[in-house]
From Swiss-Prot:
Membrane-spanning segments: none
A Pfam family this chain is assigned to: Ribosomal_S19e
Similarity comment: family membership: Belongs to the eukaryotic ribosomal protein eS19 family.
Annotated GO biological process: translation
PROSITE patterns: RIBOSOMAL_S19E (PS00628)
Annotated protein name in UniProt: Small ribosomal subunit protein eS19z
SUPFAM superfamilies: Winged helix' DNA-binding domain (SSF46785)
Keyword Kinase among UniProt keywords: no
Entry GO CC: cytosol; cytosolic ribosome; cytosolic small ribosomal subunit; plant-type cell wall; plasmodesma
Annotated organism of origin: Arabidopsis thaliana (Mouse-ear cress)
InterPro entries linked to this entry: Ribosomal_eS19, Ribosomal_eS19_CS, WH-like_DNA-bd_sf, WH_DNA-bd_sf
A Gene Ontology molecular function term of the record: mRNA binding
Gene: RPS19A
Swiss-Prot/TrEMBL keywords: Ribonucleoprotein, Ribosomal protein
């Protein structure tokens, strides 16, 4: 008996690429004017090279909310944070930008993919879960 594939059944890298292209094709996400000049955190020295980085981050965040609900802006700042290089001084962990995470979560809310959770953070909606599972079903699984 063949069952439908979910987000958990496919490779994370393949899913994020496929869902990012789906978000770009749908045209429901409005790119802010600052996407080409903003850094993704104070730990970064330059803005992202990939012009579609905003769609990739949105797809990754939607996948993370799908797999583990209750994630808010602070959790995403920790997830996408990293090591800040301080020159000759030792490196330390630094959080990523909260404005980017907040803006993407608000965009996903307007698309009805995520919603506010009463316990805090965001959770996936039923239509969002169906949308993500449809994209996952289109991805071919390598044996």
């Amino acid at each position: 008996m063949a069952t439908g594939k979910t987000v958990k059944d496919v490779s994370p890298h393949d899913f994020v690429k496929a869902y990012a292209s789906h978000l770009k094709r749908s045209g429901k996400i409005e790119l802010p004017t600052w996407t080409d000049i903003v850094k993704t955190g104070k730990l970064k020295e330059l803005a992202p090279y990939d012009p579609d980085w905003y769609y990739i981050r949105a797809a990754s965040m939607a996948r993370k909310v799908y797999l583990r609900g209750g994630l808010g802006v602070g959790a995403f700042r920790r997830i996408y944070g990293g090591s800040k290089r301080n020159g000759s001084r030792p490196p330390h962990f630094c959080k990523s930008s909260g404005g980017i995470a907040r803006h993407i979560l608000q965009q996903l809310e307007t698309m009805n993919i995520v919603e506010l959770d009463t316990k805090g953070g965001r959770r996936i909606t039923s239509s969002g879960q169906r949308d993500l599972d449809q994209v996952a079903g289109r991805i071919a699984v390598e044996p």
